[in-house]
């Protein structure tokens, strides 16, 4: 069994706290500023790209104003917000990629799907971030929460 001196025992918690605080302060270049839709997890430019894709592939069912049509649910408003509240952005993107567009599932690139999701976030009034785009990486998206405004 390892034995630690009293000095070593006192230093371990201090070192651990310092490491945790340091990890919280570090933001690698290109890292997302926030961890939820309320923090700004996409850029305005990304939403603009997504709007073009939405117009070409989505609005015929979901309407130009994102309000939906019979058989195609709204992508804005309380129903949409409550449906996804508390879910990860990975879950939302996975749903979009595996279900949309009907008859053409998987026809868009990962970046195009993410850009459309950014457009939907913008249409719901979620804030944009200045420089860090919503990522295509599923692991990164899993750490981002869809959180409705309270």
Show where each model-derived region lies:
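Gly/Gly-Pro-rich "capping" loops immediately C-terminal to redox-active cysteine motifs
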Residues: 44-47, 67-101
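Flexible coil segments in periplasmic/lumen-exposed cytochrome c-class electron-transfer proteins
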Residues: 105-150
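Short linear capping/connector segments at secondary-structure termini
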Residues: 35-36, 74-80, 136-139
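N-terminal secretory signal peptides that target proteins for export/translocation
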Residues: 1-10
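Electrostatic cytochrome c docking/interface patches
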Residues: 29-53
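Bacterial N-terminal signal peptides
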Residues: 14-27
